[in-house]
Amino acid sequence: VRWTLPSGGHATVRLVTAAPMLRFSFREYLQVDVESSVRHEFLDGMILAMAGGTPDHAALAMAVGASLDRQLAGKKCRVYSADLRVRVLTTGFAGYPDVSVVCNKLEVDTEDANTATNPAVVVEILSPSTEQYDRGVKLQQYQQIVSLCHVVLVAHDEPRIEVWSRSGEEWSVAIASRGEHATLDALG
């Protein structure tokens, strides 16, 4: 559709019909996720396919997980890979952090025994295709998890780690660059 504006210019708008958005239950999401060769996240009733990772992404996630595992040796915390699904009980969001840490007993979702609900730490390796989503929607979702103390965002293109830490109801961020250490105070 093309309009003539009062200024004499023109505006063109392309009209697109939109199909009604389908909303799924968590159980329906689980069925899709289990039966698919691609992992999915669950957000506001929508099932979102996740982008596949690169070898560098996988190696960085493994290095972060191994480092956490060494540092937590002897503590009542366990480090998990991206195979562990995490669910935010207050919003229903479910996803696969690149690395998760659960301290004390693993608590699982009432609808799925393979979904954790009580991580103390989640780590996301940022990538060009997911960085905006990870820093925005996903970070906000993770921050709703009552047990969560830290969200760690690891840059893919530079030596930079952001550690988001909870203090009461507030969250603050500390940034570690080349030669600096990222600290997860809540884990001791």
Regions found by a protein language model. Give the residues of each.
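Gly/Pro/Ser/Thr-rich low-complexity, intrinsically disordered segments predominantly at protein N-termini
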Residues: 1-188
